């Protein structure tokens, strides 16, 4: 049976992650309160941030920026929008 969490991002019960997706206390908080669906949404947003801001993940400052954005996305006021991104029209 799948583990469920009360997802703070979706505001409902949903299937939880199988393991903490990030090291340390932040990873534990995410594992305890973020669903698989919300994590997948974050990964898409993170990819847009990396691409639009041309982040080099070998740079410690870029990794720190993404960690702050991840924490803001789940537990704060939201992550930065990807600058230059134009959503496709329907």
Swiss-Prot record:
GO terms of molecular function: iron ion binding
Pfam families: Iron_traffic (PF04362)
One BP annotation, GO: cellular response to oxidative stress
Gene Ontology cellular component list: cytosol
Domain of life: Bacteria
Keywords, ordered alphabetically: Iron
Family: Belongs to the Fe(2+)-trafficking protein family.
HAMAP family named among the record's database cross-references: Fe_traffic_YggX (MF_00686)
Purpose of the protein: Could be a mediator in iron transactions between iron acquisition and iron-requiring processes, such as synthesis and/or repair of Fe-S clusters in biosynthetic enzymes.
Name of the protein this chain belongs to: Probable Fe(2+)-trafficking protein
Taxonomy of the source species: Bacteria, Pseudomonadati, Pseudomonadota, Betaproteobacteria, Burkholderiales
């Amino acid at each position: 049976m799948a583990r469920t969490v009360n997802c703070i991002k979706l505001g409902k019960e949903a299937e939880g992650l199988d393991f903490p997706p990030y090291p340390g206390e932040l990873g534990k908080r995410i594992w305890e309160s973020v669903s698989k669906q919300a994590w997948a949404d974050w990964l898409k947003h993170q990819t847009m941030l990396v691409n639009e801001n041309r982040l080099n993940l070998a740079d410690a400052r870029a990794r720190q920026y993404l960690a702050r954005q991840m924490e803001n996305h789940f537990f704060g006021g939201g992550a930065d929008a990807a600058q230059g991104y134009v959503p496709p029209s329907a």
